[in-house]
């Protein structure tokens, strides 16, 4: 299996982004350790607690520059249409929502995206920011 499963989260100590495997410490407390593939046998590893609200999973997808796309990222397509990436349990997949649709009461903003869409638009997708470092980008106007 070639699927990379990893997470990111902000350190509770210095707000640095940490990447790797997610470990549950106890109820509502999580830590990130280096990806299991990067751990050498016989070496000690660091475990760093992360803020629960900032944890996001790697989607397995990359943008046009080869940058990893994570849950919580804000992406744009051709410099337009800012969208948020989020895993939706009901659909059992990563979905997108137009930021402009998030506060509309009359619609459910999250849309499934076919695998072909990611392939067709890969050269047009750019990670603009994420909702944790730039919450102002998703505020209602």
PLM regions: where:
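Secondary-structure transition motif
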Residues: 1-141
């Amino acid at each position: 299996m070639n699927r990379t499963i990893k997470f990111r989260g902000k350190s509770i100590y210095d707000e640095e982004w940490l990447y790797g495997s997610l470990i549950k410490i106890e109820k509502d407390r999580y830590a990130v350790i280096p990806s299991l593939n990067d751990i050498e046998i016989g070496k000690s590893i660091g475990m760093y607690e992360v803020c629960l609200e900032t944890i996001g999973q790697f989607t397995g997808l990359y943008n046009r520059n080869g940058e990893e796309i994570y849950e919580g990222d804000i992406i744009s397509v051709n410099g337009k249409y800012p969208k948020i990436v989020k895993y939706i349990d009901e659909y059992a997949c990563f979905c997108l929502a137009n930021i402009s649709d998030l506060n509309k009461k009359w619609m459910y903003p999250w849309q499934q995206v076919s695998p072909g869409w990611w392939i067709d638009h890969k050269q047009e997708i750019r990670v603009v920011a994420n909702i944790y470092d730039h919450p102002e980008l998703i505020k209602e106007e």
